Amino acid sequence: MTDESKAAAVRKRGSRGRRRKPRDRRKKVLVVSAWTAASVAVLGGTALGVVYYKLNGNIKGVDINAALGTDRPRDIDNGSQDILVLGSDSRSGKNAKYGKDEGAARSDTAMIVHVYKGHKKASVVSIPRDTLISRPECATEDGRTDPGGQRQMFNTAYEVGGPACAVKTVEKMSGIRMDHYVEVDFTGFKKLIDTLGGVDITTKKAIRDKDSHLDLDAGTHTLDGEQALGLVRTRHGVGDGSDLGRIQLQQAFIKALLDQVKDVGLFSSWDKLYNLANDATSAITTDSDLNDVKSLASFAGGLKGIGAGDMKMVTMPIQYDPADPNRVLPLEEADQEVWDALRADKPIPKSATDKSAGDKGAVGSVVSSD
């Protein structure tokens, strides 16, 4: 592959909530927040054929296969699927209000979603952005080659080489080939939540975080897009103030968000259906195999049988870095248990996360996901 083709495949990339009485709602989720966009795109593609090309034009695609070539793990055709889902934290353009522009985008949220054979169960493995890893060599946007290196923060992979480098880094870490890539943008996420009419969250304690602009009392709230973004970005209001507490907040919010999509009554208003489809497809970047409405429809349709009780969400096993308490290190043996299980299409064993600094349940004392 030429430097030019490599470069073409790489992209750089508060207020209080209103109180509501808790509602008794049966929980059913598809899998992760990016799949919300895919689910709405399904409806948009089938019910609004007249705007099919408009929605297609919204979706941004990147050719991961062309960028990475053959330097990838073996494709195991056992009926399962693995998807890398990223939330981009670019502070440029419309996203500038959410923090200082540091010159390039980084992956603020990273999840490996494993859908088991039969598409009735799934596991989600969150990767802390502050994890120090061995980052592989990657092509950059301007055609150069970044050599990678040891003790690199995980989220710098996206900064250096966009989606292709993020996928390559995850594949080198896990030994698992990613079947798909989905990226969700800050501004698009916020707009989608507003179009949905907000998402219900119950906080058991007050959350105050000036950095994410989140200010919530204990109780049940309907979060608008701004507040929802604050919730998934907050770290100082939960647990020890690290990225680990934020990950658990994100996992709890995903369940509430997807439940809201299920119950929102999409067919009650064609205008709302179109707006949701338009917002959802505008908010995401996918691999080239998913960057049209028809492909998203097929993809999301295969996930609709997965319910809340069929999904396991964990954080990649890690430990605090003795040299820097603001960073974490992979627990290599425990991580290997996770990757081996997913590669074999098996459940993640409890022993893999028992000794991890993550998954301690701190968020359960703050936000209810029931």
Predicted regions located by residue number:
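Non-catalytic, solvent-exposed segments at the cell envelope interface
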Residues: 2-370
